[in-house]
């Protein structure tokens, strides 16, 4: 985390940006934990290793001392603090031209919005920290903002990001397309379907992203950029900058740790001819393992935002707006690419189309951390997973409550 006096000009500000992106590579962020729990909490993946923390998450039986729930919370706030440091310091300096200032602060606003959306999906209302902190006791007076207030701040940050960012080409740093894509996701979760459709359409129409012709090409060992990438986190084989997604899913016979694996439920959801099932799930003998990520050297990049998701965001938004022929046409784009059975509108109702799109999201985005948040936002997690409704939010880490007694715990913990 930059010290208060470390950012003095555009060069040091860009170094601070690099540090901010490094935080996203962390094993407690997109390098491992945060991606994995999105499937482990759901019907997509199950614990196959020795981690008691992961076993609790798999069973939807966490307690307030769960180590993974703490690590993803702490890393998200660490990433937020890095963004806040940039925003506060760059905003106070007068030796930046307008374009440089806008680009640098725009990237920081985006990352802060991304982290708060990640947090609100798992924990519900969370504390809003909008300025950097360096004192470990600075959070003693924190309280939780409401979910609605957190969403308001996320959208405000995305507006600020869009106003500042001028770059529209990069996929490894924040671009204008990434801002529109994240806003589409946020609005879908918020239930603003007209807004989500409009933003997703802008991503499709105003930028040069294209679906790759073959699904496996999205997840290359070399991390080659594809036409579908919108924003991705870069991994390098150095300590906490590695991606552990392939290690954790790969069978031990393939050099992995086999910490978690796809469920038989997910396997059964794929048609035998669906290329996504063939790519995402493999077997070592009779033992199934996740094979979406295949760089056992830890260098595989993670697609935080990609066009396949945006297509399905638009499809769902269109369906909820009762524009069913358009919704089905959007959904068919990912089905055709995957050689999967093609859904036709026929006499299907609006709800049946929505259900088909939700099922398609599961198949397209499997093992990318989206299934649990989908089940929760749709209000079906308790039914699908046969769990108590109080288990659909993660516990606020007890160590955080110990420091800030004003933080209330989620029900059931």
Where are these regions (language model features)?
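Acidic, glycine-rich segments characteristic of secretory precursors and extracytoplasmic regions
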Residues: 1-38, 404-413
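Inward-facing hydrophobic residues that define packing positions of alpha-helical scaffold repeats
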Residues: 17, 80-83, 117, 151, ...
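Conserved, well-structured interaction surfaces
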Residues: 52-123, 160-169, 298-305, 321, ...
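Aromatic-residue-lined binding/catalytic grooves and analogous aromatic/hydrophobic interfacial grooves
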Residues: 125, 155-159, 165, 176-215, ...
